Regions:
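A conserved mid-protein helix/loop that constitutes part of the nucleotide-sugar donor-binding site
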Residues: 22, 26, 236-250
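Glycosyltransferase donor-sugar binding loop
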Residues: 232, 259-272, 287
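Nucleotide-activated donor-binding/catalytic signature segment of Leloir-type glycosyltransferases, i.e.
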Residues: 271-289
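Short alpha-helical donor nucleotide-sugar binding micro-motif in glycosyltransferases
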Residues: 288-289, 296-301
């Protein structure tokens, strides 16, 4: 039997999983296929997710039941979530003797409830991932970054957790008197200077892609482009909702038969914002859709609008690109290192420039001109497909010693 790989996944509290959850599930899937014995520490919600995805892995339960639904924006809800995370963290510490020195331990987030159990374990082969840079303390105080919550509590927790967890992971060099082998994955090139300052050598870190479903996307047939624009995301100021709606108004006034598809369960949150804008007849809401249907809707659209004010490594841009749907976005710092010239950029946050760029791309697509057909999408797909991401993960495991296969 192959080596044991433990994933510490205490942040999963619902079966509605997000990008980071998909990331660790895909990595675990690749490790299991390569012969590793995969075990996940987490709660009852995680166990349901593992079953839904048919992941060949065991689950070591760290809670007694799923957390009841709470309002995550309210102070009471944030306190309830912290208590829930702490409960799973405490139970994980009690179960750490089940991790042997020769095992691998991987923290699937940069939060304390995943990283500290890895640091405190007996495992001499340790891994963690940095998905996104937390806002700085100054950005939190001034709300200088759009993803800082109004109460600032969640953002302070994120900042403090990431700072402490990274430093603890990088400072832990021995376990039970034996040297520790460590490896850190990061999802954006701009994170490299920070990791260098923390003392991580190039051989101790790997840049991983956010991962794309290239095969399933190519399996969906080409569609008639019946929607001029498509949008997917949360209804949050970080996503540039006001600029999105202003752009839709701008386009509806200038393009005959203008149609927009909004993917996801956003109708209820969007409707109050649409009042008085005259957009109702131009919009369609998909509601919750399968992965295959999401791909089909991208392929049925002429342009993906991305007016976000801040993002980390947004997989959704890559999803649009491999569906050969042009992307118009503000040129915020994180985009070009990941997507280069595959995106049509507008200066941040020049609304008129964004609107004009969107109009130009839609008109070109209406006339049959798609700039992506002239670009090396094959290379982009190869670099960002899940298989490549899984291969890099396995290489890091083998580099720590006793690799399967």
């Amino acid at each position: 039997m192959g080596p044991r790989l433990h994933l510490i996944t205490n942040g999963v509290f619902t079966t509605s999983i997000a990008g980071g959850d998909i990331h660790f599930l895909k990595l675990a899937e690749g490790a299991a296929r390569a012969g590793y014995q995969v075990n996940l520490f987490g709660g009852h919600a995680l166990r349901e997710v593992v079953a839904q995805h048919q992941l060949p892995a065991t689950v070591t339960l760290t809670d007694e039941d799923r957390m009841a639904r709470v309002d995550q924006g309210a102070l009471s809800g944030q306190v309830a979530m912290f208590r829930d995370f702490y409960g799973r963290f405490r139970r994980t510490l009690q179960l750490l003797p089940s991790i042997a020195p020769e095992d691998y331990a991987y923290a699937v987030s940069d939060y304390w409830f995943d990283v500290l159990p890895v640091v405190r374990s007996r495992a001499q082969r340790r891994l963690m991932v940095l998905h996104m840079e937390a806002p700085s303390f100054a950005q939190i105080v001034t709300r200088g970054r759009p993803d800082v919550d109004p109460k600032r509590l969640a953002s302070l927790h994120y900042w403090a957790s990431q700072e402490y967890s990274l430093r603890r992971f990088c400072a832990a060099t021995r376990a039970q008197g034996q040297p520790v082998r460590r490896h850190l994955f990061y999802l954006h090139p701009l994170m490299e200077p920070r990791l260098q300052r923390l003392g991580l050598a190039p051989a101790e870190r790997t840049l991983l892609s956010y991962g794309l479903e290239v095969g399933p996307t190519e399996a969906v047939p080409a569609q008639e482009r019946i929607y001029d624009a498509v949008w997917i995301g949360r209804v949050h100021r970080q996503k540039g909702i006001e600029d999105l709606l202003a752009t839709l108004q701008f386009l509806a006034a200038r393009l005959s038969g203008f149609r927009v598809m909004m993917i996801g369960n956003v109708r209820e949150a969007m409707l109050p914002l649409l009042a008085g804008r005259g957009l109702e007849k131009h919009l369609e809401f998909s509601g919750f859709v399968s992965e295959e249907e999401k791909i089909r809707l991208f392929k049925a659209s002429r342009c993906f609008l991305m007016p976000s004010r801040h993002e980390g490594s947004p997989r959704v841009i890559g999803e649009s690109l491999i569906a050969e749907t042009p992307v118009v976005a503000y040129e915020i710092p994180n985009y070009r290192p990941l997507f280069g010239d595959f995106v049509r950029y507008a200066p941040p946050f020049d609304l008129r420039a964004f609107q004009q760029a969107a109009q130009t791309e839609i008109q070109r697509m209406r006339s049959g001109e798609n700039y992506l057909r002239k670009m090396d999408l094959a290379r982009f797909k190869m670099e960002n497909r899940w298989e490549t991401t899984q291969e890099k993960f396995l290489q890091a495991l083998k580099g720590l010693g006793n690799g399967a296969g």
